[in-house]
């Protein structure tokens, strides 16, 4: 009886010691790190809003079969901006920290975020999303080209005006050619590069396109 009581006491002491060992390191960590670990385990994030991520786009790199530049903007400052990418149909993903900068156009302040994704496999379907340690955008497709032929759309000057013509042209072109590998806009992209409204209008014309088909922009 005494031996059984001794063994039970020893087991309870061991359990208490393990709880303390696993709890104290978490208490020593910054709160956001602990929260992020919990969210990562649960794979649950709030959806981003325009304050967190908008005008998301893919940018061509020197070798788009193995790398891609992802860019987006936020209204709010975000020092924890990141991109997340995975092969389509898989759960395992890679998180890529973004570099951030701030700029002001015509009195409108924007925070620009850039994530460089490398080590991709040619001819593979991926999906990505952007955000921070608490929020993520919906998943969006990202395709890496295989060796061989490709197709592209090449646009001249957008002839901006109110950008309605540019929007109609771009949307019809991508509707007629949904499988292009990338597109080029030779410029001018906008009439006034220091006017926030014009950039918003240019990106609005490409909504549903530029986040899934990479662009090679020429200012």
Regions found by a protein language model. Name each.
Residues 148-169, 174-219:
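Active-site neighborhood of divalent metal-dependent phosphoester/pyrophosphate hydrolases
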């Amino acid at each position: 009886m005494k031996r059984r009581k001794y063994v039970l006491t020893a087991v309870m002491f061991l359990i208490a010691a393990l709880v303390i060992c696993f709890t104290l390191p978490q208490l020593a960590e910054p709160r956001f790190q602990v929260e992020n670990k919990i969210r990562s385990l649960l794979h649950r994030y709030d959806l981003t809003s325009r304050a967190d991520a908008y005008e998301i786009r893919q940018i061509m790199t020197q070798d788009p079969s193995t790398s891609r530049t992802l860019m987006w903007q936020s209204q709010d400052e975000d020092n924890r901006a990141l991109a997340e990418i995975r092969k389509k149909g898989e759960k395992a993903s890679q998180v890529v920290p973004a570099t951030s900068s701030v700029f002001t156009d015509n009195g409108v302040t924007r925070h620009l975020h850039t994530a460089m994704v490398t080590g991709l496999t040619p001819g593979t379907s991926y999906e990505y999303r952007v955000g921070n340690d608490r929020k993520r955008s919906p998943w969006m497709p990202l395709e890496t080209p295989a060796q061989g032929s490709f197709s592209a759309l090449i646009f001249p000057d957008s002839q901006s005006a109110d950008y309605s013509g540019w929007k109609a042209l771009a949307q019809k072109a991508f509707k007629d050619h949904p499988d292009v590998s990338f597109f080029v806009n030779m410029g001018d992209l906008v009439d006034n590069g220091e006017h926030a409204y014009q950039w918003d209008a240019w990106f609005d014309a490409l909504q549903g396109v530029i986040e899934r088909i990479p662009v090679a922009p020429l200012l």
